[in-house]
Amino acid sequence: MKIVVLDGYCLNPGDLDWKGLEALGECIVYDRTSLTDMEEVISRIGDADIVYTNKTPMPREVFEKCPNIRFVGVLATGYNVVDVNTAKEKGIPVANIPTYGTASVGQFAIALLLEICHHVGHHNQVVHEGKWESNPDWCFWDYPLIELDGKNMGIIGYGRIGQATGKIAQALGMKVLAYDAYKNPALENENCRYVELDELLSQSDVIALHCPLFPETEGIVNKENIAKMKDGVIILNNSRGPLIVEQDLVDALNSGKVAAAGLDVVSTEPIKGDNPLLGAKNCIITPHISWAPKESRKRLMDIAVNNLEEFLKGSPVNVVNK
């Protein structure tokens, strides 16, 4: 059995191994494969039985020209890079990795928030540059600092990751306002309740995006919805970049309507030099690393191997195109 991994570098830049897949068949791992040249994708898959992809597209053309494919594993939770309908037509299961990064992504959302509230990186830098040593007072701060206790955290998308973020927010003394199409009353308590979107927008001091990217959520942070928000709101996004209309957020940051934003995702990745967010006020941008702690990546690898093992046993799991 031949296994091809089209783009394995981000998952395993060298601190993990591929032994789990190698034990199941001949395994060829490419660090990267073209996102646009489908001939390269097709050539690399060749006569493989099993294909793993993270961000490399697999449209209909790939399935048509690679007839040996029996199983596709997506090395991520999102699977929009694979034409799952064509795969289903051909009887090919596509399996994703649904829960590997819950804790890491929730933790990172709060890390963005705490950096916005305390400017730890900036103050560390200026201390090392000598500003504290030369200061006439025993302490100083270059930016206003924010206490979160008692403030409202609005979370759009209250699935596993939204709940993980909400749990930490509640531990910091925040009250969670959750918006989700599917409500679980068991999650409600004195510090967490479900609300409609307009109430979340108008009552939240911090808004975190943890919803999937669907047509109905694309651009959910736009000028119309920003106008409904509190003045000085903080916006966090480590879900999907296109949830935000970036120019609308830039305008709101520069006007002060939005006090700050913490973003681990943008509309086009890697970010382009002309992205207006790069020039916006009070905008922290990190390079899509919420998912990337070694513990999280090891969990992803283990689930990816298990997905294939279960398929080979005849009982596939985490299939997204049943």
From Swiss-Prot:
Pfam families associated with the record: 2-Hacid_dh, 2-Hacid_dh_C
InterPro entries: D-iso_2-hydroxyacid_DH_PdxB, D-isomer_2_OHA_DH_cat_dom, D-isomer_DH_CS, D-isomer_DH_CS1, D-isomer_DH_NAD-bd, NAD(P)-bd_dom_sf
Active site: 240, 269, 288
GO molecular function: hydroxypyruvate reductase (NADH) activity; NAD binding
Functional pathway: Carbohydrate metabolism
Enzyme class: oxidoreductase
Catalytic reaction equation(s): (R)-glycerate + NAD(+) = 3-hydroxypyruvate + NADH + H(+)
Stored CDD domains: 2-Hacid_dh_4
The keyword Lipid metabolism appears for this protein: no
Protein EC: 1.1.1.81
PROSITE patterns reported in the protein's UniProt record: D_2_HYDROXYACID_DH_1, D_2_HYDROXYACID_DH_2, D_2_HYDROXYACID_DH_3
Presence of keyword Nucleotide-binding: yes
List of residues binding NAD(+): 160-161, 180, 211-212, 238-240, 264
SUPFAM superfamilies: Formate/glycerate dehydrogenase catalytic domain-like, NAD(P)-binding Rossmann-fold domains
Keywords: Carbohydrate metabolism, NAD, Nucleotide-binding, Oxidoreductase
Record family assignment: Belongs to the D-isomer specific 2-hydroxyacid dehydrogenase family.
Protein's job: Involved in catabolism of D-apiose. Catalyzes the reduction of 3-hydroxypyruvate to glycerate.
Protein name: Hydroxypyruvate reductase
Lineage: Bacteria, Bacillati, Bacillota, Clostridia, Lachnospirales
Gene: hpr
